[in-house]
């Protein structure tokens, strides 16, 4: 795009960005002064969110936290908005048998990897209430929802992109911000997904293995080294996934889809018969396809002992 045209477009978005900022501040203030009612709960709620749009790796952290507390004997439940799913009315309890087209990819992925109840509702406060009423839980983790102030919370965790940070520092739609950077001063923990800054905790996303989408067969990280493969990603920042595959020595052809994209089998039909590599988030939308050349990269979030110790103390 011509730089002058881009500059004009950016300049025209500045007032909208300013309005978004004012609305964000005013809306939060209305909850602070109790103009809007905050829904409180009898069990602690941990929110894992961010102040920017786009993927920052929240879901692997939610899964890691859920598994950590589950191992401690907690009865954990998760709530989510259910982005990309067709379910829009009321709450839906997601389990491993739920249709991904109803739930969206992230809630189903969390349910599959944790074997814990996941309740989706665009009203997260209602999701928490229904989760408590329908399931035996004593700790709730909210996948995203930092800006859903109607839902009371005991711990706020913000995940930030350690490379992109806060982009150009502007609010939507001119920049990536949903809330001011100063919001970080009021949260309990900031987790950096790439690198480390003062006052932030690091998380290590560890590549584990490749798993066949159809058969569950497992292969080591070196299995596709030197081979030609198709890389498929419908996530917030696909370049991270592609770069990880390239670092494994894979000759990769990139195929980028929109975040939360619902795949059709025709999307994954290529002229050659090279393996198709995808994320776990993409995998849950492709299990019904008749293609044994699809593999997903299993990734785990490793949270620091220092972070977990301080989180336990907060609860």
Swiss-Prot record:
It comes from Ruthia magnifica subsp. Calyptogena magnifica. ATP binds at residues 52-59. This is Tetraacyldisaccharide 4'-kinase. Its EC number is 2.7.1.130. It is an enzyme of class 2 (transferase). One of its GO terms (biological process) is lipopolysaccharide core region biosynthetic process. It comes from the Bacteria. Transfers the gamma-phosphate of ATP to the 4'-position of a tetraacyldisaccharide 1-phosphate intermediate (termed DS-1-P) to form tetraacyldisaccharide 1,4'-bis-phosphate (lipid IVA). Pathway: Glycolipid biosynthesis; lipid IV(A) biosynthesis; lipid IV(A) from (3R)-3-hydroxytetradecanoyl-[acyl-carrier-protein] and UDP-N-acetyl-alpha-D-glucosamine: step 6/6. It catalyses: a lipid A disaccharide + ATP = a lipid IVA + ADP + H(+). One of its GO terms (molecular function) is tetraacyldisaccharide 4'-kinase activity. One of its GO terms (cellular component) is plasma membrane. NCBIfam families: lpxK (TIGR00682). Pfam families: LpxK. Keywords: ATP-binding, Kinase, Lipid A biosynthesis, Lipid biosynthesis, Lipid metabolism, Nucleotide-binding, Transferase. The keyword Lipid biosynthesis applies. Belongs to the LpxK family.
């Amino acid at each position: 795009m011509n730089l002058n045209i881009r500059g004009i477009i950016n300049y025209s978005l500045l007032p909208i960005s300013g309005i978004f900022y004012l609305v964000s501040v005013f809306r939060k203030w209305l909850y602070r002064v109790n103009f809007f009612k905050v829904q409180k709960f009898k069990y602690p709620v941990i929110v894992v969110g961010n102040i920017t749009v786009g993927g920052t790796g929240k879901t692997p952290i939610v899964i890691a936290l859920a598994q950590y507390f589950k191992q401690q004997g907690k009865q954990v439940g998760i709530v989510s908005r259910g982005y990309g799913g067709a379910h829009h009315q009321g709450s839906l309890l997601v389990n491993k048998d739920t249709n991904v087209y109803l739930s969206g990819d992230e809630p189903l992925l969390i349910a599959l990897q944790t074997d814990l109840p996941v309740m989706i509702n665009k009203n997260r406060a209602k999701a928490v209430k229904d989760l408590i009423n329908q399931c035996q839980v004593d700790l709730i983790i909210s996948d995203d929802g930092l800006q859903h102030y109607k839902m009371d919370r005991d711990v706020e965790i913000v995940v930030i992109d350690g490379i992109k940070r806060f982009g150009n520092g502007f609010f939507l739609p001119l920049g990536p911000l949903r809330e001011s950077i100063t919001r970080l001063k009021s949260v309990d923990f900031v987790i950096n997904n790439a690198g480390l800054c003062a006052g932030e905790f690091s998380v290590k996303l560890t590549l584990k293995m490749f798993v066949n989408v159809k058969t569950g067969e497992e292969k080591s990280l070196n299995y596709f080294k030197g081979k030609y493969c198709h890389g498929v990603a419908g996530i917030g920042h696909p370049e991270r996934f592609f770069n990880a595959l390239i670092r494994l020595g894979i000759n990769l052809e990139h195929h980028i889809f929109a975040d939360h994209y619902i795949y059709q089998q025709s999307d994954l039909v290529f002229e050659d018969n090279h393996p198709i590599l995808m994320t776990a988030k993409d995998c849950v939308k492709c299990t019904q396809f008749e293609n044994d050349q699809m593999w997903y990269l299993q990734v785990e979030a490793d949270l620091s002992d220092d972070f977990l110790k301080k989180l336990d103390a907060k609860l």
